[in-house]
Amino acid sequence: MLYYLHYYSGYLGILNVFKYITFRAMGAAITSLVLCWLLGRPMISLLRKLKAGQPIRGKEVVKDLAALHGSKSGTPTMGGLLILLAVSLSCLIWVIPTNKFFWLSLLSMLFMGGIGFWDDFKKVIQKKHYGISGKIKLLAQAIVGVVVGIVLLADPETSRLAQKLTIPFLKEVKHIDIGWMAIPFFILVVMGSSNAVNLTDGLDGLAAGCTIGVAFVYAVFSYISGRADMSGYLFLPYIKGAGELTIFCSALIGACMGFLWYNCYPAAVFMGDTGSLAIGSALGVVAIILGQELLLVIAGGIFVIEATSVILQVASFKLTGKRLFAMAPLHHHFELKGWSETAVTVRFWILSLLFGLLALSSLKIR
């Protein structure tokens, strides 16, 4: 909304800064960060009054995990509401309100946040341990993929890119035409991203910290893709209006930083499915809009590893009756092997940073 102030720069020159994406991106990050700081304690107090405490998985299933995390029982969850609120308000202040890519990303995030809230509500308020069914979550993620696909394919400006799969690090074979397979592929991306972040959200600060690096990578790619000069030089497709996603990603970065203030060990609040499903969906949708879906595998390497560990664990147990890991997702494996929770979290943050740098290096290594 503040973007329109630059039209009055003739009266007050400094207002011209509101035209620049970089300035508005910094403003969005700071705004969402401050909003999380200010709203964090009231939100946590409200969740405590509602008795929205997180039940600890493992008391009946994995006794060792229950022993490690038993003290967390009753910690308020659904803290993802804080992230959703901060991102939404920040973006409404700093993003051009007519930008279709912003609305597509934000509405997808809010929709999956609503599904996550429903799941958390059933778990912590209605005391139904398993929440909503996995089929409902998958259906919701499929709906996001289909809607995003229809919007992009119906628009002549984005239709061609939406049907092409961009290969990172390759200059000669940088696109593969997937045609009508685009929508099924988008569904897979949203499902994979949303569930991977959800699986990663098992330790204090882990998912939020890893999200910061991934969102930064896509903030950079959004900025470059939205500029004809820079995108041409770096062999990225030019997408008119994509620069506003830089602001969306920056708001997400700020919100995750602010949330970490309360979510770092020992956590005063958990994001729950309200936050993890929403964040994963948002990252997936941004990747789809930019045509950088495969880059998400690199930038979100920790999310991929966590999800893969669960898949391998289930497959191994069903095929051989043996488990590959002490427990899945992988962060619990290291906990049960003797690593402290903070050690696992910080080491995974470091790896996430390295994955982010590797993803950014694809801009020049071609």
From Swiss-Prot:
Q: Which Pfam families match?
A: Glycos_transf_4, MraY_sig1
What reaction does this catalyse? Answer: UDP-N-acetyl-alpha-D-muramoyl-L-alanyl-gamma-D-glutamyl-meso-2,6-diaminopimeloyl-D-alanyl-D-alanine + di-trans,octa-cis-undecaprenyl phosphate = di-trans,octa-cis-undecaprenyl diphospho-N-acetyl-alpha-D-muramoyl-L-alanyl-D-glutamyl-meso-2,6-diaminopimeloyl-D-alanyl-D-alanine + UMP
| Transmembrane spans | 27-47, 76-96, 101-121, 136-156, 176-196, 205-225, 241-261, 264-284, 285-305, 343-363
Keyword terms of this UniProt record: Cell cycle, Cell division, Cell inner membrane, Cell membrane, Cell shape, Cell wall biogenesis/degradation, Magnesium, Membrane, Metal-binding, Peptidoglycan synthesis, Transferase, Transmembrane, Transmembrane helix
GO cellular component terms attached to this protein's record: plasma membrane
A single GO BP annotation from the record?
Answer: peptidoglycan biosynthetic process
Q: What is its EC number?
A: 2.7.8.13
Describe its function.
Catalyzes the initial step of the lipid cycle reactions in the biosynthesis of the cell wall peptidoglycan: transfers peptidoglycan precursor phospho-MurNAc-pentapeptide from UDP-MurNAc-pentapeptide onto the lipid carrier undecaprenyl phosphate, yielding undecaprenyl-pyrophosphoryl-MurNAc-pentapeptide, known as lipid I.
Which named protein is this? Phospho-N-acetylmuramoyl-pentapeptide-transferase
